[in-house]
Amino acid sequence: NVPVARQFVLLEAAALAVTGTLSLYADGFRIKWPNDIYYKDRKISGTLSECNIGSNGITQCIIGIGININQQMFTSDAPNPISLAQILGAESDRKEILDQLIYSMEQYLRKVSEGQFDDIHTLYQQKLYRANGRHRYRDNNGEFRAEIENIKPNGHMILKREDGTLSEYAFKEVTFI
């Protein structure tokens, strides 16, 4: 069982499984907090999740992962999509990628079931998009520059602003610019 306070580890595991799978094809995939996967400054994958909570922790969690594999053109209003085919210059076998993703997800879920939360969290932080340097962000008070100080085990992101102030954000409370 995963304690409620550590449910973010399931999203970390999923993000690591996706980056690990895609890294078999090319280098440079990073996790954009909390769970999108980027190649350079373009989004290749997104994840949605819904977890049920019981008295002993997480009882069930459904994780949906979308990966742009062979798309050459995008018709959505997403501002920065990219596909594996665009990166590689050739199409890939979707079944092969799915099999590799399932295998990788099973490996990470095994680590979760063994309680290796801190190991997964460390790996997640090592793969973060924009992990180094100051970047532009926006919250309810406007735009600012900051660097990622930490991602807490509960999934909150700590940003260190240029004046040294630390700000903590839950999902959707801050936007990368």
Segments (PLM) and residue ranges:
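Long, positively charged amphipathic alpha-helical accessory segments at protein N-termini or as interdomain linkers
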Residues: P3-A5, E12-F29, Y39-I177
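Short loop/edge segments at beta-strand edges and connector loops
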Residues: I31-W33
